[in-house]
Amino acid sequence: MALALCLQALCSLGGWLSLYVSFCRLNKHRSYEWNCRLVTFTHGILSIGLSAYIGFIDGPWPFTHPGSPNTPLQVHVLCLTLGYFIFDLGWCIYFRSEGPLMLAHHTLSILGIIVALVLGESGTEVNAVLFGSEITNPLLQIRWFLRETGHYHSFTGDVVDFLFVALFTGVRIGVGACLLFCEMVSPTPKWFVKVGGVAMYVVSWCFMFSIWRFAWRKSIKKYHTWRSRWSEERQLRLNGHLKTH
């Protein structure tokens, strides 16, 4: 069983590495980070779809059955995601592209997945955490691509930012709090699994503070821009009215 899990994780790692190399060859004029973010975007879409299917259709429901035995589909998805996080953590360390908070998030994710796979249980809530963590990931990558291509300061960029902040606050913080509560009050999950859940939620709040600061600064900037434009238009209307007299 352990050998099969290791092989699945290694195959996943090899798959993500191969996808990254393929993107690098197809997009030779782009940076390494561009191609890595394409891999991240692909993983985000794939993991959202798979984890949503597990949580909402295949089951079991994470809010009522935390600590339950892993299903075969959960194991496959966790191995797929484990390979990705190992790839991305190695990439971030090699290129020194991320700070301690993101590295801590990836490390906790890897440890959480490994624990669930080794125990053979708690895949239900780990899968739910995966869904909550990845649901904003595609938006984050789209935002980066918009900035790189010079299209960020537009209506599309504003929509992406709004959806990102709203989803992060509502799902990762709001729904995440409910999931953590269910995890803590349930007698089934192991105590160290609960500690890992608390650690992941603390990391989410650290991200949340940074996101709220960004949202506040952008809102203030947008407000001042609107006020300035409104004042200029008002002045032009007044000047035009005076000239007619």
UniProtKB/Swiss-Prot annotation:
Subcellular compartments: Membrane
Pfam families tied to this protein: TRAM_LAG1_CLN8
Entry's transmembrane regions: 1-21, 38-58, 75-95, 99-119, 162-182, 191-211
Domain TLC: 29-204
UniProt keyword annotation of rRNA-binding present: no
Taxonomy, superkingdom: Eukaryota
Membrane topology label: Multi-pass membrane protein
Record InterPro entries: TLC-dom (IPR006634), TLCD5 (IPR042512)
Main location class: membrane
Keyword Oxidoreductase in annotation: no
Keyword field: Membrane, Transmembrane, Transmembrane helix
GO cellular component, one term: membrane
Family from the record: Belongs to the TLCD5 family.
PANTHER family according to UniProt: TLC DOMAIN-CONTAINING PROTEIN 5 (PTHR31898:SF1), TRANSMEMBRANE PROTEIN 136 (PTHR31898)
Protein known as: TLC domain-containing protein 5
Organism of origin: Bos taurus (Bovine)
